[in-house]
Design a protein with these regions (language model features):
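Aromatic-rich, lipid-facing transmembrane alpha helices and their immediate juxtamembrane interface loops
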Residues: 1-141
Length: 141
């Protein structure tokens, strides 16, 4: 895994979460669009950099199938990291009392959002790789 990609995915994940939670507050009647995240989420989102080497193995799969694979992987990562953070007493999310939750750590109804997020990370990582390749060809990297 490339550290540059880890850092960029961590930042992109934070941004996606802030936008997502902002829309959530708006849907609950708060027009201020207040979004939030946690510092704990940075390394979790940073792990999306693992999509880069995985993509090379599955790039010929249909787009939606790749998205479902990413979403399943993300939800597994969410469950494992959430379980560890809960054990340490610092888990920033708790889905207990919401529909379709698993142990209050994962929400199955978020699967479509994770499909989109996984594919967004794939596109971001492809862009970064192509940009680096183009700069290298020009002798700028």
């Amino acid at each position: 895994m490339k550290w540059r990609n880890f850092f960029i995915c961590g930042l992109a994940g934070w941004c996606m979460e802030i936008v997502f939670t902002s829309f959530g507050t708006f849907l609950h009647g708060d027009p201020r669009l207040l979004g939030q995240t946690s510092l704990w989420m940075f390394p979790i989102y940073g792990m999306a950099a693992l999509i880069d080497p995985i993509y090379e193995k599955i790039k010929y799969w249909p787009f939606l199938l790749r998205g479902c694979f990413y979403a399943t992987s993300i939800m597994l990562g969410e469950f494992l990291s959430g379980s560890l953070l809960r054990f340490l007493g610092v888990c920033p999310w708790d889905y207990s009392g919401t529909p379709y939750n698993i142990a209050g750590i994962v929400r199955l109804d978020y699967f479509p959002f994770w499909v989109v997020a996984g594919l967004a990370f794939e596109v971001l990582l492809r862009f970064l790789d192509e940009r680096k390749y183009r700069l290298h060809q020009k002798g700028e990297a």
